[in-house]
Regions:
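Topology signature of small-to-medium multi-pass alpha-helical membrane proteins
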Residues: 2-153
Length: 153
């Protein structure tokens, strides 16, 4: 008679409590960014009015060139996908958030250096963009820390 034993699990990868704060926070943050993207790309006049955009700001988004549009699209949807992947504890979250971060940096470089983003949209939105960029860097470091704890599969 052969007795088969189940392997004993010596280490259990428990999730820290902050995982359930950080994950939903980023889903909400990037979900709001996706909503902004859809409303802005759809040229919704009511949305522009609710944001307090003037004619120059509306024209800025209405005549958006292809290259920054690609950067913006990948940055927004990549970041949202990364936040969802984090909640699913997927190991793919790290490359996805890294891609989103790279495209976000490219978008900021192009729009601030060549499209007069600061002058047209103002200080408030420029600081907001910088804050989102910092939060995305934070997400990358957080995901790497969760990977080091074997919290990602």
């Amino acid at each position: 008679m052969v007795v088969r034993r189940r392997p004993v699990q010596t280490t259990k990868s428990r999730l820290p409590w902050h995982f359930w704060v950080v994950g939903p926070f980023y889903v909400l943050l990037y979900g709001a960014g996706a909503y902004d993207y859809v409303m802005t790309r759809g040229h919704d006049p009511a949305y522009f009015e609710s944001q307090g955009y003037d004619d120059a700001q509306i024209a800025y988004f209405t005549d958006y060139p292809l290259v920054p549009d690609v950067f913006w699209t990948v940055a927004v949807w990549g970041a949202l996908c990364a936040a969802v992947l984090l909640l699913f504890r997927s190991r793919w979250v790290i490359p996805v958030v890294l891609i989103a971060l790279i495209f976000q940096v490219c978008l900021d470089v192009v729009t601030f250096a060549f499209m007069e983003r600061w002058q047209i949209l103002g200080t408030r939105l420029a600081l907001f963009d910088a804050g989102v960029l910092r939060l995305t860097v934070g997400l990358l470091f957080y995901c790497r820390a969760m990977s080091a704890r074997d919290a990602l599969r």
